[in-house]
């Protein structure tokens, strides 16, 4: 079973970090509820977040502000199963939402399995990924009744070490990865872990 996770271009990651440092305002919605095109998911993110989805127009001014090729970024999102890329200014975190499909022989009864079984299943996924180290796997149940496996992730993106906290859940044959990434490559601090949990806790499914 080979699971492909989203990869970013170095240019986009650098541009997003620059936006935080420069306090670029505004390409986010006024409402803090974000409907993610292409997947039946809504998230609550702070107003003022910078948000990219697959439906961001290729000629949107956001790409000019970031000084990146909008067509290339959107192609990258589609190629790598990435449905949302959002940057928060306070705290300085990047959030991504990825959905991939599991092979039919790798399905698990997510709702009825024991916590240890869920962690073991997710750890088996991580073992097959390159440049990824996961630890501190645990199960988190949100107020929405969604069960997640939560893990701390040490990875590499274009030769740069990244630290993140990832929440994984499965619905049917679909795996959803919600990842909160330290924007500057530093280890997440306690308040940032709490914030990632808050965002995961606000995730809602609006359909099957």
What are these regions (language model features)?
Residues 57-165:
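Conserved polar/disulfide-associated segments of primarily extracytoplasmic proteins
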Residues 163-177:
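A short, solvent-exposed beta-edge/loop patch
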Residues 49, 175-208:
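Surface-exposed amphipathic alpha-helical segments
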Residues 37-59:
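Proline-anchored loop/turn motifs at beta-strand termini and strand-loop-strand connectors
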Residues 13-23:
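Bacterial N-terminal signal peptides
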